[in-house]
């Protein structure tokens, strides 16, 4: 019997871009656009992970899936990604509410 190493599942976690501390501060419109792009990219990644999990679930239910662990990994990845997205959303709402409570001048 041959023993092989564990194959990667093809997941590459999102890594935030590195900032150069010597760069001047950009205007708020540029920073807002970059933040918006990051949010949209994160939601697109979440949707892709959930779609993969759903596709593998259908294959598992119909008997077309050869390795059930592929579905288990995809379902867990989708669950963790969803939990992370909800946590980020909650923190963003907390920050927004805190800013709204700040007194003006």
Swiss-Prot record:
GO molecular function: cytoskeletal motor activity; structural molecule activity
Keywords, ordered alphabetically: Bacterial flagellum
InterPro entries (alphabetical): FliE
Single GO cellular component term: bacterial-type flagellum basal body
Compartment list: Bacterial flagellum basal body
Matching Pfam families: FliE
GO biological process, one term: bacterial-type flagellum-dependent cell motility
Disordered: annotated segments: 10-30
PANTHER family, per the entry: FLAGELLAR HOOK-BASAL BODY COMPLEX PROTEIN FLIE, PTHR34653
Family: Belongs to the FliE family.
Protein name listed in UniProt: Flagellar hook-basal body complex protein FliE
Native organism: Nocardioides sp. (strain ATCC BAA-499 / JS614)
Lineage: Bacteria, Bacillati, Actinomycetota, Actinomycetes, Propionibacteriales
């Amino acid at each position: 019997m041959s023993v092989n190493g564990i194959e990667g599942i093809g997941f590459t976690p999102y890594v935030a871009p590195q900032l150069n501390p010597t760069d001047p501060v950009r205007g708020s419109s540029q920073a807002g656009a970059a933040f918006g792009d990051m949010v949209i990219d994160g939601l697109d990644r979440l949707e892709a992970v959930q779609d993969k999990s759903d596709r593998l679930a259908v294959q598992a239910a119909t008997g077309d899936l050869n390795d059930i662990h592929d579905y288990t990994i995809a379902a867990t990845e989708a669950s963790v990604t969803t939990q992370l997205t909800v946590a980020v959303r909650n923190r963003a709402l907390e920050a927004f509410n805190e800013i709204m409570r700040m007194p003006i001048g």
